[in-house]
Amino acid sequence: MNHKINIVDLGKMDYKSTWDLQIQFQEKVLKGFEQDTLFLVEHEPVYTLGKNANKNNLLKTKSSDVKVYNVERGGDITYHGPGQLVGYPILNLNNYKKNIAWFMRTLELILIDTLAS
């Protein structure tokens, strides 16, 4: 089963604008108005706190300009910043196997293979 995925390089974009774009695209992809898309982006320094985040793990930063966002994902705290390429896949998982463990493992293998080549 092969699916085409749009790859969109957003360049540098702040986290909030990228998050808003993901939410808008998610609706369009689920309704079939847009095809599956992978957004690639570089953020200014930002920390995101997943649903399992322990705020004690967030060390005080040297700069008060670093923003912190609570986000709708699992995990703890993640840092994004300059020089780091971040990928956000917006996919209709109904078109794939409906097993999230399969999806995460497949995504991991694709990234490993891509970086190895």
What positions do the PLM features span?
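N-terminal lobe of the biotin/lipoate ligase/transferase fold
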Residues: 1-117
